């Protein structure tokens, strides 16, 4: 109730307990050689979460409301926790050994594309779904022998408009690893 006042030494309960169920189904398929690669793989994961009681936790979705000091905010209905939420993850990767038809003997090349889409609902547990949020990643890895690895990766966050606090957090990664 908005009208309630909190007095000195009063405890404010910011957390509670409720039943929470998550389901996840994953599948991996190796297509074998094709499209010039030695192996082509697809990973699909479907996720679902269900919370039995969302009362009193209307805006508990992580990052659902911006914090503005001294200003109360009621927020909009699309920022509220929902009883159920679901989304999917896709990852497609390919391996190519002895890249460039043997010109680079001992070099393996692995491009990968990953997609994440929170389709419907908001949840803070079991996958942290935020309706409409999407992430796409493109990654390229080159390995020389068993010891040297180069990785280049870029990620784009999009979707969910002003509710997505990761919207401006696109990232680039460059990594060199040497194992001995």
Can you say where each PLM-predicted feature lies in the sequence?
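Outer-membrane beta-barrel translocator domains and adjoining extracellular loop/strand segments
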Residues: 1-4, 54-61, 121-131, 160-167
């Amino acid at each position: 109730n908005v009208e309630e006042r909190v007095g000195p030494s009063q405890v404010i309960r910011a957390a509670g307990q409720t039943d929470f169920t998550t389901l996840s189904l994953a599948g991996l398929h190796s297509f074998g050689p094709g499209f010039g690669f030695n192996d082509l793989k697809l990973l699909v994961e479907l996720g679902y979460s269900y919370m039995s009681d969302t009362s009193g936790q209307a805006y508990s979705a992580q990052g659902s409301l911006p914090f503005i000091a001294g200003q109360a905010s009621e927020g909009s209905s699309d920022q509220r926790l929902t009883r159920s939420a679901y989304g999917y993850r896709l990852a497609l990767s390919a391996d190519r050994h002895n890249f460039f038809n043997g010109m680079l003997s001992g070099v393996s090349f692995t491009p990968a594309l990953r997609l994440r889409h929170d389709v419907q609902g908001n949840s803070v547990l079991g996958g942290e779904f935020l309706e409409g949020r999407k992430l796409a990643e493109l990654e390229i890895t080159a390995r020389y022998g068993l010891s040297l690895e180069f990785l280049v990766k870029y990620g784009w966050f999009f979707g969910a408009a002003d509710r997505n606090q990761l919207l401006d957090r696109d990232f680039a990664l460059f990594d060199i690893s040497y194992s001995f």
